[in-house]
Amino acid sequence: MITDDKVTEIFCTIDEFCKKLDVELQKNLKLPSSDGSGHRRRNRKGQLSDSEIMTILVCYQFGTYRTFKEYYLCSARQRMRSLFPKAVSYNRFVELMPRVFFQMMLFMKLAAFGSCKGITYVDSTMIPVCNNVRRYFNKVFRGLAKDGKGTMGWCHGFKLHFVCNDSGEIITFCLTGANVDDRDRRVWDVFALELYGKVFADRGYISQSLFEMLFDQGIHLVHGLKANMRNKLMPMWDKIMLRKRYIIECINELLKNKANLVHSRHRSIQNFIMNLCAALTAYCFFDNKPEALPVHVEKSMQLELF
């Protein structure tokens, strides 16, 4: 169970970011005082601040409760009553959640995520939204969720592609349908904006065209070999770092088992996106993030092509 000290730490970090963001928005963003019909626009503050809403969403991802309604009613409004004295009703809080999407995305990207350090690991994981038997009856994600097959079998939902550095920090992510291949160029166009150096992947990313495209952009894709492939020479340092892909596997484990990234109780697309952002944001506050063992890194800016 998350402690009050941890909740306070999360709130102070988010609140400080939100205050700086509000100052920048007031300087550079000019909102109209009225809408097109001539009526004045309301700008009244609510009982819960944006930082409090974001804190409640992030704290839910620490794995104590499996349903958000039980967490909010039993924990946020009772056990943490002293921390959130002006907590609104559950139905009202669900309506307020999409309001902090902009702030949550900026905090996740600017404060929670790390940066590329030249050593990157890439992986993807399935996010099912319902049982495969009920995929034809799902109305919430109709037209958005897709059928795809992964290492664990068929899945109806989405696929989360993400990359992390050797310190266990998530760099960026890309959400697609479950039927999108890991080697899809649209996914790597997003990743290439943040990456440089070497990217270590599993055998599912084997593609000559992908390797050449990334190599032209200064990114060296390193992956293992399949059993029916011809053996190729590989530097010993690449073999050592390729075996350290447990870093991103541990991140997958934390997001799925500790955080509530995967469940089939979403009632709207907006809440699904907010739950995804909250899970990725909460990961940066976990105390048991994986970290690679120190190894000797050769100081060379030259890419290796075989």
Predicted regions and their residues:
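Short alpha-helical elements
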Residues: 1-306
